[in-house]
Amino acid sequence: MNLVVLLILTLLLFIVSYVVDAGQVILVDSNITRSFVDMEADFSPSVTTVETGVVYVAEPLNACRNLRNKPEQSPYGTSPLVLIIRGGCSFEYKVRNAQRSGFKAAIVYDNVDRNFLSAMGGDSDGIKIQAVFVMKRAGEMLKKYAGSEEMEVMLVPPNTEDSVWSLYASIALILSLAIFCVMVTCVFFYRYCSTIRNSTSQFNGMCRRTVKAMPSVTFTCAKIDNTTGFSCAICLEDYIVGDKLRVLPCSHKFHVACVDSWLISWRTFCPVCKRDARTTADEPLATESTPFLSSSIATSSLVCIDSPPLGSSVSFSPAHVSSSFIHQFVRSSPMNGSRISENLRRQASPLQSSSQRSHLSMKSSHSLGYSTMSPLNAMGMSPYRPYPSNASPGLFSSTNHLLSNYTANTFSHFASAHSLPD
């Protein structure tokens, strides 16, 4: 890409030099007028005014030797011009031969048909006549009308005003191209930096320091070392006595270089069992029954105790109630653990003293024929869990006070101190 830009800039500079130095050779006759673009020689005086004269063909045509023809003095006071073809010798030598022969200006035309003009270079020491270069078709046209005094040739200097505007336009074009190249370069650089940044952000390996901190052993025998096998599962090379093996938390072993490269540059799990190498060795493996969330992030909803079917007679001690129901609620709501423990201690003695009264109350409730289902069941919601028959009213009143945010609408007027649901 840089080479293409350099070539374009060179071409533009060449066009600028062509536009600035380009003049005109005009062929004027009573019937025709032809204009041709020319380029002044670097070593000859510049054409500052319009030069008018009759053109003559050089003999020899390439003017590499002294010219045999001499210019004739025109009665109209015009200057004699000589027409020379390119090739055979240098431009400077041609112009010097034309100057020695007495011509006032030399017109050199190309010997090959091209679409551009070539600059004529040489030593300007002693050169006093003007010299211009034209294309091949212009030289052939001038050669056709050479020697005719009725056909005049005019050398017109470059238009200074047009040249300045052309120079400004060329400079603007070059600046626009340069800005475009800079923008393209910035875009490519931005994409390159984005690619590097994305590849860095998508790094999936482990820290080198963490990998190096993993334990390693020296291989002695596969059976003694309890290794994965007799060969490394990464490079498939057999273990040799004395090889350093890296031990992952899953107890699989690999060559140190192999598994270090795997963990640092590629993935963070064991290549064999896919266990995460960032875990500790005593951490239990994840199974299909492993919950997605740990117990510390468990839901804060009330955990109910499974009870036997309705109608069965089961006795629960206060200690059993406190160690099951309250313990499960504390696990589901860690924020209220200390508060529940304090209230539980306060209710320890009332529970023991009111055990018998609770038993009698349960019997009386059966004799009165109250329904064994709570109003919550009657509303079509979650099933009501029956409470133990020997539990005291104090336990339920305390629990109802502690769990007011969860069970405010659970108990009805049946859950009183003297009538509890079965």
From Swiss-Prot:
Zinc finger (RING-type): 232-274
Glycosylation site list: N31
One annotated Gene Ontology cellular component of this protein: endomembrane system
Main subcellular localisation: membrane
GO molecular function: zinc ion binding
Membrane topology: Single-pass type I membrane protein
Listed GO biological process terms: protein transport
Lumenal side, ranges: 23-168
TM annotation in the entry: 169-189
Cytoplasmic compartment residues: 190-422
Keywords from the named record: Disulfide bond, Glycoprotein, Membrane, Metal-binding, Protein transport, Signal, Transmembrane, Transmembrane helix, Transport, Vacuole, Zinc, Zinc-finger
Keyword presence, Protease: no
Subcellular location: Prevacuolar compartment membrane; Protein storage vacuole membrane
UniProt region (Disordered), positions on chain: 344-368
Signal sequence annotation: 1-22
InterPro entries the record matches: E3_ligase_sorting_rcpt, PA_dom_sf, PA_domain, Znf_RING, Znf_RING/FYVE/PHD, ZNRF4/RNF13/RNF167_PA
Residue span, PA domain: 81-146
SMART domains to which the protein is assigned, alphabetical: RING (SM00184)
Name of this protein: Receptor homology region, transmembrane domain- and RING domain-containing protein 3
